[in-house]
Design a protein with these regions (language model features):
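Short beta-strand segments enriched in small/hydrophobic residues
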Residues: 19-21, 53-67, 169-179
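N-terminal helix-turn-helix DNA-binding module of bacterial transcription factors
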Residues: 1-54
Length: 325
């Protein structure tokens, strides 16, 4: 049997070869008229295809952690954006229902994680269904497409903000405790912060505060009781900003009069809102929508990593100790 050359078919129809691949992969973005033309051409060349668009099964998987409601909101927004397309949606949680998740992977075409930092799960899903297209949101460790924030850049922005406000002697940065296993994004934020601050103020003392995520008891008040406490705290995540603000309140410290607080992600997680390194979640959803509707041809299993720019949003929680030089 003769081998079919998709590029020749594309030239015959005066379209791009990418469009031919999209029709073969049942992509939703190809117009009905173009789809029929491509299917007819494929059938003439002996590659028999059905012109009807088949509904695709999409797994929406989110982790049950402190930010699960935030992740669910992102996935629901994505689902609403794609509501007019023939998708079948299934919600899964791979950590608490791994057996069911892997079973659902067999018949799914797309899996969207928010997030998935576990390479083992990724490998197992690909073993069960090699054609499964995996998008990973808010984490850039694994996935065919990984859409995340530029955490290192965010840490650098935090360091510049504190430096410009005169906090150059004694600072603290909060990160998860090692047993929590959520180190990647938080670690990159802390690394960016440390690297930039060491460049700007080499003699600055920076304490690394490990805060357990799975304990109800807040250990931060003990750190804030020291006579030589830091002048500012960079909280590398939503949870840490909340905990730090609560610890300051419990210790009788006022923000920013007694101590400054700089957060990451959502300024309104504290009352009143704190200065924060933020990103636009709409961008994550928009890019996820684009890649679902325009599935790329990925060769050799090489993943595509997309990092979103960060920006500073100020609300007056960082006290200015001296003017910027």
């Amino acid at each position: 049997m003769n081998r079919i050359n998709f590029r020749e078919i594309a030239r015959e129809l005066n379209i791009s070869h990418t469009t031919v691949y999209r029709v073969i992969n049942n992509a939703q973005c190809v117009s009905d008229a173009t789809r029929v033309r491509v299917i007819d051409a494929l059938n003439r060349h002996g590659c028999y295809r059905d012109a009807r668009v088949k509904p695709q099964t999409v797994l929406l998987d989110f982790d049950e952690n402190a930010a699960s409601s935030y992740m669910r909101d992102l996935l629901n927004l994505l689902r609403n954006r794609l509501a007019g397309n023939p998708f079948r949606w299934i919600e899964t949680t791979h950590k608490t229902g791994q057996a069911k998740f892997l079973l659902d992977c067999r018949d799914a075409q797309i899996a969207v994680f928010a997030p998935m930092a576990d390479r083992k799960i990724y490998t197992q899903a690909k073993e069960i269904n090699p054609d499964l297209f995996i998008l990973n949101l808010l984490d850039d460790t694994v996935g065919d497409i990984a859409i995340a924030t530029d955490d290192f850049q965010g840490g650098q922005l935090a360091a510049r903000r504190l430096y410009e406000c005169g906090h150059r002697t004694h600072l603290a940065v909060t990160v998860p405790a090692p047993e929590d296993g959520l180190q990647h994004s938080f670690s990159n934020r802390a690394k960016g912060f440390l690297a930039e601050m060491m460049f700007l103020a080499p003699n600055c003392r920076i304490e690394r505060w490990e805060v357990p995520l799975r304990r109800t008891r807040n250990s931060l008040p003990q750190k804030l009781k020291h006579k030589r406490r830091p002048s500012a705290v960079f909280a590398t995540g939503l949870y840490f900003a909340k905990k730090t603000a609560a610890a300051c309140s419990a210790s009788g410290l006022r923000i920013p009069e007694d101590i400054s607080l700089l957060g990451f992600d959502k300024p309104d997680c504290t009352e009143p809102p704190c200065d924060s390194i933020v990103f636009n979640p709409e961008q994550i959803v928009s890019w996820a929508e684009f890649f679902i509707m325009n599935r790329p041809v990925i060769k050799n299993g090489a993943p595509v990593h997309l990092l979103l720019d960060m920006k500073l949003e100020t609300h007056g929680s960082v006290k200015r100790l001296n003017p910027t030089p």
